Amino acid sequence: MENYLIDNLDRGILEALMGNARTAYAELAKQFGVSPGTIHVRVEKMKQAGIITGARIDVSPKQLGYDVGCFIGIILKSAKDYPSALAKLESLDEVTEAYYTTGHYSIFIKVMCRSIDALQHVLINKIQTIDEIQSTETLIVLQNPIMRTIKP
């Protein structure tokens, strides 16, 4: 079912669940004028097709004490170092996202820390000690005015 094409009902279901993943199928069924069974079948088909990959709860890092967010561009010593560098970065709790990119940086990561001092510790004692990394550039996040996912 890899080439499942979504229709307007699927789009509506996705938008509703992206807004609140805990919305009951019965409520969605009423909203779209179909049976709860239809909603269930559609959701299962989208799961099998890899369109729906899970449900999650969003938390506020700031409310949990993470006051410093940053993006770090990483230049590797060699392209062949990517798998091992990525494995080491993945082991760091402060690294919340990683991207393999084109352009100046080989890897771009998002890091969350409780303070500037904590960020400095992560940079000096964790990230910059990874042998495969040649250099880094850190961009501190001042605001996150737009945060959304794609529309189905």
From Swiss-Prot:
The keyword Cell wall biogenesis/degradation does not apply. SMART domains: HTH_ASNC (SM00344). Residues 25-44 bind DNA. One of its GO terms (biological process) is response to amino acid. Residues 6-67 form the HTH asnC-type domain. InterPro entries: ArsR-like_HTH, AsnC-type_HTH_dom, Dimeric_a/b-barrel, Tscrpt_reg_AsnC-like, Tscrpt_reg_AsnC/Lrp_C, Tscrpt_reg_HTH_AsnC-type_CS, WH-like_DNA-bd_sf, WH_DNA-bd_sf. Gene3D superfamilies: 3.30.70.920, Winged helix-like DNA-binding domain superfamily/Winged helix DNA-binding domain (1.10.10.10). Keywords: Activator, DNA-binding, Transcription, Transcription regulation. One of its GO terms (molecular function) is identical protein binding. The keyword Transcription regulation applies. Transmembrane segments: none annotated. Activator of asnA transcription; autogenous regulator of its own transcription; and repressor of the expression of gidA at a post-transcriptional level. This is Regulatory protein AsnC. The gene is asnC.
